[in-house]
Amino acid sequence: MAPKGKVGTRGKKQIFEENKETLKFYLRIILGANAIYCLVTLVFFYSSASFWAWMALGFSLAVYGASYHSMSSMARASFSEDGSLMDGGMDLNMEQGMAEHLKDVILLTAIVQVLSCFSLYIWSFWLLAPGRALYLLWVNVLGPWFTADSGAPAPELNEKRQRRQERRQMKRL
């Protein structure tokens, strides 16, 4: 049963600690996926490793680097001169936040990278990321913009106001 009342807010220190743990967790995922990929593809099957295997590794490293750097800059905390925590950074575990999408990109890349040890065609699953981005763009930005009313309809005037406006226009002429 859910607790009654207002949901408690989390303090700066708790957000700071959770952000550190989240970054550590995703760094482990990145290092683990790269270790598995390099071990299987570039060590065991070195003789059959093609140019595309190296390109896939470079692509995944670029995606990991950009995503992790964005997450760490979002979670950067600020401290006062005496060393006390002033701001714990943006909450990386916030639902529907940008960090959630970055974490999804890291997880998708790790899964695709490990599965691509069996076949390089698995990298086509990475097209899910731009597909999801286009979906979110349509649902949150473009769809409402295209389907929005062109403007507020003109308020209908009652007869008295309409006659008054007509008289004013006649006086101006």
Swiss-Prot record:
Residues carrying N-acetylmethionine: 1
Listed GO CC annotations: endoplasmic reticulum membrane
Topology term for the membrane: Multi-pass membrane protein
Pfam families, per the entry: TMEM208_SND2
Transmembrane segment boundaries: 25-45, 51-68, 105-129
UniProt record, GO biological process: autophagy
Keywords in alphabetical order: Acetylation, Autophagy, Endoplasmic reticulum, Membrane, Transmembrane, Transmembrane helix
Cell compartments where the protein resides: Endoplasmic reticulum membrane
Family membership noted in the UniProt record: Belongs to the TMEM208 family.
The protein's name: Transmembrane protein 208
Source species: Mus musculus
Gene: Tmem208
